[in-house]
Amino acid sequence: MGQWIELTASDGFRLAAYRADPAGPDKPRGGLVVVQEIFGVNSHIRAVCDGFAADGYVTIAPALFDRYERSVDIGYTPDDIARGRELKARAKIGRAHV
C-alpha cells in the first residue's frame, strides 16, 4: 500500500503524488513513473502503482491536475469522462507544466 507525498516542480509549485514502495529488505528493481489518465490519481492508478511495487519497483504517480484542481479522483461514468476531458483541456496536457 502506497502513501501520498508532495513533489516540488522546477517553478516551485507543489503537487501531490502517490508513491508505492516495494516491501521487504531487497533492493528495489528500479523506479517507475505512472502517468494518470483523465480521471486523476484515482483508485485504478493507485492500484497500478501498488502492483508494480509488489513486483519490486518504486512507483510514483504525480497528480498532474493539481495546478488546476487538487485531489482529482473521479470514476468512469459518462459525467466523469466529460469532467476529465474538461480538466485535460484546462491543463493543456502536452505542454511542460510539471
Which residues fall in each region the model found?
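N-terminal cap/leader regions of alpha/beta-hydrolase-fold enzymes
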Residues: 1-95
